[in-house]
Each structure stands twice: as C-alpha cells, then as structure tokens.
Regions:
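Short N-terminal helix-loop-first-beta-strand/juxtamembrane motif that initiates sensory/input modules
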Residues: 46-49, 197-201, 316-334
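Beta-lactam-recognizing serine transpeptidase/beta-lactamase-like catalytic domain environment
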Residues: 58-59, 64, 272-287, 298, ...
C-alpha cells in the first residue's frame, strides 16, 4: 500500500514537471532571457561666448577626469571595496565630508563595535518589535563618539569621500569622482587598473574658462558644479526637460538666462541589461552636441578700456576729501538705434578674503541697483511739460529764488539766471525752470511766500507715466535676469514733486538712463537693450564661429507720444549743454571732434550703502547722459557715480569718466581698419557736470 502511494506521488510529480516544461517552458525561457533597455544621457560641454568681433570670452577647458558608474546590481560592499582600491591610486579632497557621513562610515567599518553600542534592554525591545531598524541605527549614530569620528583619517577618509561620490547618483549614470587637479600620473595609473576597478573610468571633462579674467565676469554669470548639480528650487523644471540631478546649469546672468541655448544636446547611450541588471551591451543612440554659442553685443576691447578708466578715476577721486563713502561707479554704452549694449561696466571698492581693499567687478549693478540721478532727467521733464501744455517750446520763465510758505530757505538753481527759455534751462541746468514747469503741470501758480497748492497725486501719475515712456522707473527689458525697476517715492507732498522734476526723488538704474538718452537720441523710439547679438551653431575648429541660428533683431518697446519737433528741440538743448557757452558740460567736452550732446546731473541724496553707521548721511550722486555724433547718433552713454562725495564741493568724477570713455570709443573706432567698434556700431557720448560750490541739480 505504501509502495503504491509513493508510486502515485512520483507519477504526479513527473506529470507536473512535464507540464511545466512542455506548457510553460517557453515562458520560463523568455523570463530567463529577458533583457531591459536603459537609455542614459551623458552631458556635453556648454556653448561658448564670443564678443561682437569674434573674440572668445568664455570657453571650455578640457580636464582629465575620473568617473564612476554604478550598475543596478552593485552592492554597498562592492562600492566600498572599489572606493578603497581607488583611494590607493589618487588623492581626494576630504574637506567637504560631513560628520554624519563619517559616523555612517565608522559603523560600516566597525559592525561589531557598532552593535555593542546597543544595550541588552534595547535589543530585547527590538526583538519584541518595539524598536525598528531605523531606531536602532539612530541610536548607533548618536553614540559614535567624537574620538571615533576623528579616527577616520588618511586613506580611510579618502575612501569615504570617494564612496560618497559613488553613491550620489543613479544607476548607469556616470558620476564625477575627480576632475580638478587630476595629475598625469593619477590618470595613467587609474587607466592601467580599470579592470580591477569595476565601474570606474577615465575620461575628459570640462570647466569654464574666462579669457579676459574678471572683465565683465558678473554679467557672464556662473555655472553650478557637478557636485552641486541642479539647484533644489529648480529641480522639477530641469528634470522635466531631460536633465540629470548632477548636471551643471547656469545659475546667474547670461549663463542662467540662456541655459536652454548653452546646455547642448546630450549624448544618448542605450545599455542592454539582463534580468540581474548586468550590462550585456552598450549602443550609442546619438553622439550629442555641444551647446550653441552666443555672440555678445559687447566689444571687449572697449569694455576693458572702460573698466580701466572707471578704476583709475575712482582711485584718483578717493584721494580727495569728502569721498569716504564713494565705493562704486557705472557706465553703459549702447547703440541708440538697435539697443545693442557695447559696454556694461561697473566697479565697486571692497575687501577681499584677506581684508585687503580691492576693486571688484560690479557690472551687474547696472541693472540691479538704482539711485537718484539728478538733473540728467531734465530732458524728460521738459518734454512732459510740452506734452501736458504746461510750457511750449521757446517759453521764457524767470529763474529766481522761490519762497514758499513754511520753508525758511528759498529753493533756487545753482545760480540765478533771470528770464530764460527752455533751451537755456537745459544748457545751464536750471532747477527753477523745471519747478515752474511742474507747478503749471499741476494746475498751480507760484505765489511768493504763499503755499504750494498743486494736484500732486494726478501730477505724479502723469509724470511717472511720461517718464516710463523713456524707460525711467520701469524695466528696460534687457536680456538679463533680476533687472529691477527702481523705487518710486512713497509720499505725495508738493515739495517732493519739485524734487521729482530734477531727479531727486524716484530712483533709476544706470541702464534705464542709457535707454532714456537713447530714446531722445534716436528721435523717440524706446529700444530694448540686449547683450546677446547672435546665437550660432557650434563647430569643432579652434574658437571659430558656426552658422547663425538666430540674429537678435532690434525691438522698439514704444514710441514717445510727443511731436518730433519737441524731441528735436530737447536734442538741441542737450547739444548746448556740451558745446555752447556756459553749458554745464562745455568745460569738459569743449573742442572734441565727435560732436556730443548730453545732460549732466547732480543729486542731493541720502546714503544707503554698506557702511551702516552712515545710513541716511547726506551725499552727492553724480550722473551723465550723452550721445554722439549729434547729427547721426551712433552711441548713447550713461554714467552714474552714487555717493561721490559729501559737502558742497567734490570731484567731478562723472565728467572725468564720461570724457575719457567717449574719447576711448572714438579712438578705438579710428584705430580699426573699417572704423567703428564692429560692423555698424556707433559710439556714445557722455555728459553731466558738478560745478564746485553750486547747489545740486545741474
């Protein structure tokens, strides 16, 4: 009976095995032979940047690099073993290894000692499922002593640093282990031992190289490191566009603004793996292509000269009394017809890491900082007066001290000019002419020693709307991130409206001033400034330009809602400032050959810079706007020097910078075979003077 039962059981087993082999055999075979296709994106170098004349500004320097690719089946123990082997062959920076990682590593290296850190009572709770693995591990971490952490030194610490890199990415995605200061000896010895270092490879990486050093550096922007990868706040956006977490991306200015252009097309590699995750074959799906190149509107020869001029004039001014708070200056040069920015320069005096006083690049301040700029805006005040009917071209008003009820001191120009017309008011920078214009604009009337009664709310609105047509108090649209619009004053008192009319209330950025004077220079078109001139396909030859993908066209944001003859009249007034009689710019620009026009500016302001103890100290801001040549403007310029000096007199650094920059521009144009800073580019003028001992407002 027993034999029969055993026989039947074996028969059933044989039949079942036969069924599995015959009926399901193919299914099992397919399961065993099942493979998986995994496509990995490998990064490529970023696009380069050139100046308008084809000079390389930002390049990629090749670097020897050591990478690690984790397979799907790679265990923690295997990674640790490979890391230890690699640590014997290379040196690895360990300064960024956090204490927590050292504790984790100590526990991995000393499992028995780590286990002993848990009490018998705690193990009993664990066995009773009242403590879980996570809680036990936390207790172990908390009990690793400082001495045990400090015991991780030398090769062990380098092993940990390498292991951290191994473990930082996803399976089948190469991670940079070392790409800085890889010695030829390290590169060679690792290459020779690759068969003993599973997942490790030697390759070529890149880093950004700036051909002109710190020149324009703040505008060019920065790129994240492969270690930092994509910033957390932008992770979702970039992952949705096929980026990897450790990809290097632009994090400021041009590198950020044109990330989608500069990033390039990644190489795609298909890895075929078996069921266990072992790679069976690798196929290149697409080779990838370096990011597209940017050709900037900037002329780097001019940019270097402008920066040198700013530095020299600032150091010179700092030797004079009253300039303790002077720490920055800005210059913008742009083509008034196309909006191409030829130079965007800013410098700031500060301290380096050793506490030494140095001059730093602050070109970004042209779009991210704003100031009271003084009388440079009087062209907009006059044109707004025409538009509202407060004055007509040729109207005469008496420049005299103005006495208002409740105001002990009279309000006056830097000099009493008597009866003057609009052109003369611009030429000599009359404050009183502007004040009487804005009083009329507000339906008021000047009564000596009487109250100032005007509709301030409506007039502020009218003037700000009008000024915005020139680009004052509104973003210019420049192709850079983080542009600010300036700050409008928050109060509507009548006296503040008078300050507004002479540029001493609302604040404006240097690039807004450049757009404003360009609008006047070109006859009324507010043109959007731009830093990028062209986008080009990359080519492999040494720093040569490829075919044009896109050429940035001039963009007119708006046209002044004003008569052409009004604009021409203000242009004439600006010419008188620079070239006629006692114009406030004549002393500096008399006799120059490039036929400039412009407007000087001085503003009584309150300090709000980095020296906290001097907050709200009275200071003088200096500015200058200009264009040239007068008959056919090629270039527009804005100069802004905040907090230039304290007291009634000080160095006219705005004029010194402006004159030298204008001269440099035209000298550079003459020195070139075809003339001009580049094809079709023109130059810029400058204007704005401070007369010693005179009230601000010139």
């Amino acid at each position: 009976m027993v034999f029969f039962v055993v026989f039947m059981l074996f028969s059933i087993l044989i039949l079942r095995l036969g069924e599995l082999q015959i009926v399901f055999g193919d299914d099992f075979k397919r399961e065993i032979e099942r493979t998986e296709d995994i496509t990995v994106n490998n990064p490529v170098p970023r696009g380069k940047m050139f100046d308008r004349n084809g000079k390389i500004i930002v390049d990629n320097t090749p670097l020897n690099a050591i990478t690690y690719t984790k397979y799907q089946t790679t265990t923690q123990k295997e990674m640790l073993k490979t890391a230890a082997q690699l640590a014997k062959l290379i040196t690895k920076d360990t300064s960024k290894v956090p204490v927590r990682d050292k504790k984790d590593f100590w526990i991995m290296k000393h499992p028995d000692e780590a286990k002993a850190k848990i009490t018998k009572k705690e193990w009993d709770l664990y066995n009773q499922k009242k403590l879980d693995d996570k809680q036990i591990y936390k207790l172990q971490i908390d009990r690793v002593t400082d001495e045990e952490v400090e015991s991780i030194q030398g090769e062990d610490l380098e092993t940990l640093a390498i292991y951290r890199d191994f473990n930082s990415g996803f399976a089948l995605t190469p991670q940079i282990v070392k790409n800085k200061e890889v010695t030829p000896e390290e590169f060679a010895v690792v290459s020779e031992n690759l068969e003993n270092l599973p997942g490790v490879d030697t390759t070529t990486d890149w880093e950004r190289m700036y051909a002109f050093g710190d020149t324009l550096k703040s505008i060019l922007g920065d790129v994240t490191t492969s270690e930092a990868g994509i910033p957390k706040e932008q992770l979702e956006k970039y992952l949705a566009h096929d980026y990897s977490r450790n990809d290097r991306v632009g994090k400021s200015y041009l590198e950020l603004k044109y990330e989608d252009v500069l990033h390039g097309q990644k190489a795609k590699v298909k890895n075929v793996t078996d069921k266990a995750g072992k790679i069976l074959s690798t196929e290149v799906v697409s080779e990838g292509k370096r990011g597209k190149d940017l050709v900037l509107t900037i002329d780097m020869d001019l940019q270097q000269q402008v920066e040198k001029i700013i530095e020299e004039e600032m150091w010179s001014a700092k030797q004079k009394p009253g300039t303790a708070l002077l720490d920055r200056a800005f210059v913008v040069l742009m083509n008034p017809h196309t909006g191409e920015v030829l130079s965007l320069a800013g410098k700031q005096i500060g301290k380096d890491s050793d506490g030494k006083t140095v001059m730093k690049d602050f070109a970004g301040g042209n779009i991210t900082t704003s100031y009271n700029v003084g009388s440079a805006v009087k062209g907009a005040t006059i044109l707004t007066g025409y538009k509202t009917g407060a004055i007509k071209p040729g109207d005469y008003l008496v420049d005299e001290p103005l006495f208002f009820k409740g105001t002990p001191k009279p309000k006056k120009s830097w000099k009493t000019f008597g009866s003057i017309n609009d052109l003369r008011a611009l030429q000599v920078s009359s404050n009183v002419y502007m004040w009487k214009t804005v009083i009329a604009m507000g339906q008021g009337k000047y009564i000596p020693k009487g109250p100032l009664v005007i509709d301030t709310e409506k007039t502020f609105s009218t003037m700000r709307q009008s000024f915005s047509q020139f680009g004052l108090g509104t973003r210019t649209g420049v192709d850079l991130p983080n542009e600010m619009s300036g700050f409008p004053g928050s109060d509507n008192k009548p006296g503040l409206l008078l300050d507004f009319a002479i540029g001493q209330y609302d604040t404006y950025t240097p690039i807004q001033l450049a757009q404003y004077v360009s609008t006047i220079a070109n006859g009324g078109n507010r043109v959007q400034p731009h830093i990028v001139k062209e986008i080009r396909e990359p080519i492999m030859e040494n720093n040569e330009l490829g075919p044009i993908v896109e050429e940035i066209q001039p963009k007119v944001l708006n046209h002044l809602d004003m008569k052409d003859e009004w604009i021409k009249r203000v242009q004439e007034g600006f010419k008188m400032v620079m070239q006629v009689g006692d114009g406030t710019g004549v002393g500096t620009f008399k006799g120059v050959s490039y036929n400039p026009a412009g407007k000087t500016g001085t503003a009584q302001a309150f300090y709000d810079g980095p020296v906290k103890s001097q907050k709200n100290a009275e200071v003088m801001n200096l500015s200058l706007v200009s264009f040239a040549p007068f008959d056919n403007p090629e270039v527009a310029m804005a100069v802004v020097v905040p907090w230039a000096y304290q007291g009634n007199t000080g160095p006219s650094i705005n004029m010194a910078i402006g004159k030298r920059v204008m001269d440099a521009y035209f000298d550079l144009k003459k020195s070139r075979p075809v003339g001009g800073t580049a094809e079709g580019v023109q130059q810029s003028g400058n204007a704005d003077t401070t007369q010693n001992g005179q009230q601000s407002g010139q």
